[in-house]
């Protein structure tokens, strides 16, 4: 599997996990109802499936690396969905996390 395909899988996983969590948040905190919560739970389940498509056989490695994608993706989601404006420290932290993801997943072994 190419690095590009692996990165694409991480991006899809992030959409499902962050989107799912956001839908649950909207259903509970913003009182949008059970449909939103149910859609969020379904999206979170899809995230779990997408993670299994990564080429590495080690669950811990995949989830640890995905953590970096989750951090950066959450900031991007907040910008797009909620008008959040990250500061330079948010951006710096996200870049550090993405660097960590790249080392964990793609360093030669």
Curated annotation (Swiss-Prot):
Write down the membrane topology.
Answer: Multi-pass membrane protein
Tell me its family.
Belongs to the UPF0060 family.
Q: Name one GO cellular component term.
A: plasma membrane
The protein's location, in the record's own words, is:
Cell membrane
Instruction: State the superkingdom.
Output: Bacteria
UniProt cross-references to InterPro entries, sorted A to Z: UPF0060
Per UniProt, which keywords does this protein have? Cell membrane, Membrane, Transmembrane, Transmembrane helix
Predominant subcellular localization, coarse grouping: membrane
The protein, known as: UPF0060 membrane protein RHA1_ro06609
**Entry's HAMAP family?**
UPF0060
Could you list the residue ranges that cross the membrane?
7-27, 33-53, 62-82, 88-108
The organism of origin for this protein: Rhodococcus jostii (strain RHA1)
